[in-house]
Amino acid sequence: MSEINSQALREAAEQAMHDDWGFDADLFHELVTPSIVLELLDERERNQQYIKRRDQENEDIALTVGKLRVELETAKSKLNEQREYYEGVISDGSKRIAKLESNEVREDGNQFLVVRHPGKTPVIKHCTGDLEEFLRQLIEQDPLVTIDIITHRYYGVGGQWVQDAGEYLHMMSDAGIRIKGE
């Protein structure tokens, strides 16, 4: 309370209640003037308005927290859905990669050699054994020979993938296609 001596007012009120003769009640009545009562009522009203504002703020905060919780749960749900979706995509991709890796070209048996002897037409040869030994023999026969090694990918009848020359030749002959050999 601003201009009111609240302690003196309290003491006068307590003494006025306990005095049988009413002498101290006169002191209380002197201290409690209409302006004091109005000031006390104004202060009480300000306190009630303050409490009401705080209650409204608390209610607004509670509503905001509730909305944020709903948004958080929605975001968590979407995140879980996306995580599951991308885990599926990763799984499918991993399976696809594994399948593609299993279909990789094996170089053994898929290599052809373009052999060029000086002054002669280049010849294409297919190595069926150890490649290094085969190359060594070619170089021993003609040290000036140049050799290009070509790895070939075979596609058989109907565009099917085949792993090596032997499988390719077998598939072609099964389809009735004759291949002129060396």
Curated annotation (Swiss-Prot):
Q: Which Pfam families match?
A: Ead_Ea22
What InterPro entries does this protein map onto?
Ead_Ea22
The name under which this protein is listed is Protein ea22
Q: Which organism is it from?
A: Escherichia phage lambda (Bacteriophage lambda)
